Amino acid sequence: MNIRPLHDRVIVERQESESKSAGGIVLTGSAAEKSTRGIILAVGNGRILENGSVQPLDVKVGDSVIFAEGNIKAEKIDGKEVLIMSEYNILAIVE
């Protein structure tokens, strides 16, 4: 995949969520929630500050992250669905 996000945006591949409930029931359709975890595939150069300097991002390619769903753009690139979001949408890095 050859894509470079701009500024503070990142490209994330969503990880599949568990399709079974805690009780072992298989969830289908709307009952199965979309995962809010993913792997960072690409990062922009950073956020441009008011003074013109660039603040590097805290995340890097390969990081496993938890993100908020709001203000995310889903795109198909090379046949794979990826998410384009601002670093602001990332809530945590899973270590």
UniProtKB/Swiss-Prot annotation:
Any one cellular-component term (Gene Ontology): cytoplasm
GO BP term, pick one: chaperone cofactor-dependent protein refolding
GO molecular function: ATP binding; metal ion binding; protein folding chaperone; protein-folding chaperone binding; unfolded protein binding
Keywords, comma-separated and alphabetical: Chaperone, Cytoplasm
Keyword Cytoplasm annotated: yes
InterPro entries for this protein: Chaperonin_GroES, Chaperonin_GroES_sf, Chaprnonin_Cpn10_CS, GroES-like_sf
Compartment(s): Cytoplasm
Family the entry assigns: Belongs to the GroES chaperonin family.
Subunit structure: Heptamer of 7 subunits arranged in a ring. Interacts with the chaperonin GroEL.
Purpose of the protein: Together with the chaperonin GroEL, plays an essential role in assisting protein folding. The GroEL-GroES system forms a nano-cage that allows encapsulation of the non-native substrate proteins and provides a physical environment optimized to promote and accelerate protein folding. GroES binds to the apical surface of the GroEL ring, thereby capping the opening of the GroEL channel.
This protein's name: Co-chaperonin GroES
Organism: Aliivibrio salmonicida (strain LFI1238)
